[in-house]
Each structure stands twice: as C-alpha cells, then as structure tokens.
C-alpha cells in the first residue's frame, strides 16, 4: 500500500447502517498499463454479505483494498453511509473496518499480544471470548504455554488454519461494523475448513461483509454476488 496521509482535522466517520457505495471508481497501479478496475458502480446494503468472484487478477482484491484506503482511486468516489471516505479521518475509517486475509501479519510475540493488538483496551477475558468465537481457544489451550506461547516470526510455529483463526479472533475483538474477508485459497483439511467456516459465521453475523470468495459454501451464503472480470463487474445476482 502507498502511504495515505491522515488528515487529523477531518471528521470521524458516523456509522449507522454501514451501507457502501462505489460510484464510477477506477484505479490503476503504478507502472502498469491497464486499469485494475474500471468505472465500478456498486451498492452494498448494510449488514449483508456480498461475495466477489472471478479469476486471479480480475480486480477483486483491488475493490476490497480501496475501502480502508490502502490506495485511493484515480477516479470516482466511495461512500460509507453517504460519507465520502476521502473526507473522513483515516484512523476513524480504519477503526470501523476489519480485514481478515490469507496474508495475516503476525508478530514474534505471544498469542495473547497478537490478538490484543486489534484492541489495546481489551481485557484478558475479552481476548479469550474472541478466541472461543473464532474456534481458536481449543488449540491455544493445548499449546505449551497457552495464551503466553511465543509464536515465532510471522507465526512460523502455527499451521495455516491456526493463523486464520488468530486473524478471525483479532477481527472479532475489534468489534468493527465492516468486515473485509479474503478467503484463503491454501487448502485446509476438511475438519479445519469446517472450523474456520463456523468462526467466520460468528464474525460476520450482523456485519457488512465483503468477501473474495473461493468456496462454494461462502457463495451460497452470500446475499449478493458480483462477478469480476478484467476490472469490470460483468454480472451480479
């Protein structure tokens, strides 16, 4: 992501329904010829799940990454509850959005510290509760030092499924009304996949959720589906 400056004098975002709208949004990465997304128009109803499907490089991740302003579009505007996100304090915007990605960033610290990073005022009890909802508590308790277990640089001592559950626990602890979910394509075994899916169901309940979907079960559960191809939305339903 490029360095978007936070303007401290801008107002905090006011979330009511967490409706999202993209109006004529186009974006091109530096040193690339083609636009990653081109004149995207979409409306997402608050507290619903919207799935984006399409081949790799179609523009799905770009759409997701524009919402917390990891990048700003060259054209068009993005609104949350009718507020242009460029006119909102950046810290306030990002506090209201949780990203659960396959590229989770973990620190060489304890499991507890890695989860509490999402909400520095959270109590130990709240951390444990978030882990229970994320189906992470069970495996954490089996570790040599439980929540005080050091996980190594970027969580090297954890499996893919365990990392994902840590990421989900973090998002649950953050209590944000908007969830961005980039489903892991890495193959989890059937049991881990079921556990992760249940954790995601707990996380996304009553939240506005945008998901880059790779699993049929997610697509079935979505309230709306957008098909993305070559930076365009070619179908929805």
Question: Residue locations for each model-derived region?
Answer:
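Pre-NBD coupling/linker segments of ABC/ABC-like ATPases
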Residues: 2-15
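ABC-type nucleotide-binding domain
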Residues: 13-237
């Amino acid at each position: 992501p490029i360095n978007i400056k936070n303007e401290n004098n801008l107002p905090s975002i006011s979330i009511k329904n967490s409706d999202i709208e993209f109006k004529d949004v186009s974006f091109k990465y530096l040193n690339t010829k083609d636009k990653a997304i081109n004149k995207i128009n979409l409306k997402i109803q608050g507290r619903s799940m919207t799935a984006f499907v399409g081949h790799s490089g179609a523009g799905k991740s770009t759409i997701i990454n524009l919402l917390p302003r990891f990048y700003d579009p060259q054209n068009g505007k993005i609104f949350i509850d009718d507020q242009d996100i460029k006119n909102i304090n950046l810290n306030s915007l990002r506090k209201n959005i949780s990203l659960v990605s396959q590229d989770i960033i973990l620190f060489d610290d304890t499991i507890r510290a890695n989860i509490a990073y999402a909400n520095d005022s959270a109590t130990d009890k709240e951390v444990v509760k978030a882990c229970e909802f994320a189906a992470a508590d069970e495996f954490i308790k089996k570790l040599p030092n439980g929540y005080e277990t050091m996980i190594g640089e970027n969580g090297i001592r954890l499996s893919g499924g365990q990392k994902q559950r840590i990421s989900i626990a973090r998002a649950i602890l953050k209590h944000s009304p908007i969830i961005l979910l980039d489903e892991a394509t890495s193959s989890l075994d059937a049991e881990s996949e079921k556990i992760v899916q249940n954790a995601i169901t707990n996380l996304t309940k009553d939240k506005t959720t945008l998901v880059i979907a790779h699993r049929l079960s997610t697509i079935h559960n979505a309230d709306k589906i957008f098909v993305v191809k070559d930076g365009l939305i070619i179908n929805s339903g």
